[in-house]
């Protein structure tokens, strides 16, 4: 999966590292391969996309490490030749996928293709959306919540008096890192209405109204100053889907507001989160 090494710590707080930390805590020996870092640094005239270097790296790592299980996350550049090699070694494989796949969510058709592309080459798939979105008869496909990690989500905001009331952060793309001139995120309409209706509430919002997104340690400092957070993902609310924003808010002890249409109240009670119907 993508461990974002090339971003020098800005994207350190990601799902792949949370999962790795969990595997290690359970006593497993984990070897990490950052596919997008490999293809990014190995593009040349003989390997325009860097995928040949990735294939060589994966195969050599398998030969040297001899894993019992290979866990794949958003690794779109893995070739069929590499999957055939993995199968020849009789190694169990699974994939996880955390981008939206529900109707009328960003890039949902493209994201569905990304999941289904590998579905016949892995033993199981884990999605942060209700798998029935892809069809009722899809086998070996399961829901997995966004993971939290005790070494990442270290704040206990419920134990402190915060200077801000409600925190929310978004961006125009994690890899870009900065706001894109002329781009409008559909959530801005909802947020601006929310702010206008609640003038007595102190909002701390990043990624809109000319306020740049926050990342890494700057994100942690910002989120530490609010007692509540808004969990608002792009696109139409989909059963069980949320970005990892949910983990960053609830895991750090913020009282979190969640759209009821996500049906995440199947997992959280009214004493654990606030589920809203609309702006009213």
Please give the residue ranges for each predicted region.
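Short linear sequence elements within intrinsically disordered, low-complexity coil regions
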Residues: 88, 272-273, 280
């Amino acid at each position: 999966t993508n461990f974002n090494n090339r971003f020098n710590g800005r994207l350190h707080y990601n799902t792949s590292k949370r999962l790795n930390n969990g595997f290690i805590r359970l006593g497993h020996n984990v070897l990490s391969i950052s596919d997008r870092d490999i293809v990014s640094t190995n593009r040349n005239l003989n390997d325009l996309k860097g995928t040949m270097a990735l294939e060589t790296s994966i195969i050599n790592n398998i030969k040297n490490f001899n894993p019992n299980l290979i866990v794949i996350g958003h690794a779109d550049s893995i070739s069929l030749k590499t999957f055939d090699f993995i199968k020849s070694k009789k190694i169990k494989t699974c994939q996880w996928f955390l981008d939206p796949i529900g109707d009328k969510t960003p890039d949902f058709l493209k994201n569905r293709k990304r999941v289904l592309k590998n579905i016949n080459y892995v033993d199981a798939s884990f999605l942060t959306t209700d798998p029935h979105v892809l069809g009722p008869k899809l086998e070996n496909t399961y829901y997995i919540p966004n993971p939290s990690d005790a070494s990442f989500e270290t704040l206990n905001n419920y134990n402190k008096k915060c200077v801000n009331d409600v925190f929310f952060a978004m961006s125009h793309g994690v890899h870009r890192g900065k706001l894109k001139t002329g781009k409008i995120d559909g959530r801005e309409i909802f947020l601006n209405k929310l702010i206008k209706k609640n003038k007595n509430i102190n909002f701390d919002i990043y990624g809109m109204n000319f306020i740049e997104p926050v990342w890494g340690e700057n994100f942690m400092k910002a989120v530490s100053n609010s007692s509540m957070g808004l969990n608002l993902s792009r696109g139409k609310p989909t059963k069980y889907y949320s970005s990892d924003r949910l983990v960053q808010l609830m895991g750090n002890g913020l009282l979190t507001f969640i759209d009821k249409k996500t049906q995440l109240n199947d997992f959280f009670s009214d004493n654990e989160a606030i589920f809203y119907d609309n702006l009213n």
